[in-house]
């Protein structure tokens, strides 16, 4: 079967609404790509998106009158004269394969690789985390996840407990376990994240060393030598009393999900209790790390 595709440039705030509307008017599949043409796998219901510009790509049956689709998008205010869009005829393809072809093994730091489960690992002697992008955030394609993975790779985790606050797919907790941590604890507000983390941990053979909690069920007085939290700057500041209490004496803290422009305000919130390292930036994002004083 042949298809026709419309690709339009949008913003993180509008992408979801446009996607809903495209499905309403007959699109059989809507996907998002970021500015690097990397598929965005991680949307969570109601979550603020962490990326900047988003391209919305909608697939329609080849018989669809695409000029009518453009008219409807304009009528609804989803397309104006400043919005770039492109319509393309697409030959029959294995869509799933095409999507899978876009997700490649990625290296973080010296030892760590994140590999889609359907690909061969590039280095069997490396620390390989096998991951299938699911509904929960965290494949390593986002700069904030990458910054946290690189930080974990650089730590000596042997025998340590690691808390992954806002675990999403569980990628950071699982990477920590594979990098030598004794145990990891994943916490998230989203039940989907708990499920995804459990599945991914099982796939990586570390489920017996990963405890998972919904935020509301998190035990009191939990502490770890290493705490990593890749959520947004706002919640990181609000959660300062909670997150800082999770870190054991002289323990390490890694924070991301922070725009570079927000680094100063997050540092201000944490510097009373932590000796902070230099902020590391990647694209418009950054990572803040430090040690409990
Ligand atoms: C940006 S994702 C990070 C996922 C993964 N740790 C990574 O680095 O790719 C943020 C995650 O934090 C969770 N989250 C957001 N606010 C939270 C909160 N207040 N408490 C716990 N989890 C939260 C979201 O549900 C989401 O799964």
UniProtKB/Swiss-Prot annotation:
Subcellular location: Cytoplasm
Gene Ontology CC terms: cytosol
Pfam family, one: PrmA
Highest taxon of source: Bacteria
Catalytic activity: L-lysyl-[protein] + 3 S-adenosyl-L-methionine = N(6),N(6),N(6)-trimethyl-L-lysyl-[protein] + 3 S-adenosyl-L-homocysteine + 3 H(+)
EC numbers: 2.1.1.-
Alphabetized InterPro entries for the sequence: Ribosomal_L11_MeTrfase_PrmA, Ribosomal_PrmA_MeTrfase, SAM-dependent_MTases_sf
Any GO BP annotation: methylation
GO molecular function terms listed in the Swiss-Prot or TrEMBL record: protein-lysine N-methyltransferase activity
Matching HAMAP family: Methyltr_PrmA
NCBIfam families recorded: prmA (TIGR00406)
Function: Methylates ribosomal protein L11.
Protein name per Swiss-Prot or TrEMBL: Ribosomal protein L11 methyltransferase
């Amino acid at each position: 079967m042949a298809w026709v595709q419309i690709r339009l440039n949008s913003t993180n705030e509008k992408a979801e609404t446009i996607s809903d509307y495209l499905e309403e008017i007959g699109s059989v599949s809507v996907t998002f790509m970021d500015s690097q043409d990397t598929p965005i796998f991680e949307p969570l219901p109601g979550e603020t998106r962490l990326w900047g510009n988003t391209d919305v790509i909608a697939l329609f049956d080849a018989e669809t009158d695409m000029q009518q689709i453009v008219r409807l998008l304009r009528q609804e205010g989803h397309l104006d004269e400043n919005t770039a869009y492109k319509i393309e005829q697409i030959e029959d393809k294995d869509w799933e394969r095409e999507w899978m072809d876009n997700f490649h093994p990625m290296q973080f730091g010296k030892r760590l690789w994140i590999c889609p489960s359907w690909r061969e690992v590039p280095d069997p002697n490396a620390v390989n985390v096998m991951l299938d992008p699911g509904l929960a955030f965290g494949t390593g394609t986002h700069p904030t996840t990458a910054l946290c993975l690189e930080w974990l790779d650089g730590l000596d985790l042997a025998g340590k407990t690691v808390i992954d606050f806002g675990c999403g797919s569980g990628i950071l907790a699982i990477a920590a376990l594979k990098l030598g941590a004794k145990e990891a604890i994943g916490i998230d507000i989203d039940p989907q994240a708990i499920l995804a983390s459990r599945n991914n941990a099982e796939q990586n053979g570390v489920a017996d060393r990963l405890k998972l909690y919904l935020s509301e069920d998190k035990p009191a007085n939990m502490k770890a030598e290493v705490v990593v939290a890749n959520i947004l700057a706002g919640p990181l500041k609000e959660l300062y009393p909670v997150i800082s209490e999770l870190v054991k004496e002289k323990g390490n803290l890694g924070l991301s999900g922070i725009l570079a422009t927000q680094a100063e305000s997050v540092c201000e919130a944490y510097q009373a209790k932590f000796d902070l390292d230099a902020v590391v930036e990647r694209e418009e994002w950054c990572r803040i790390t430090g040690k409990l004083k």
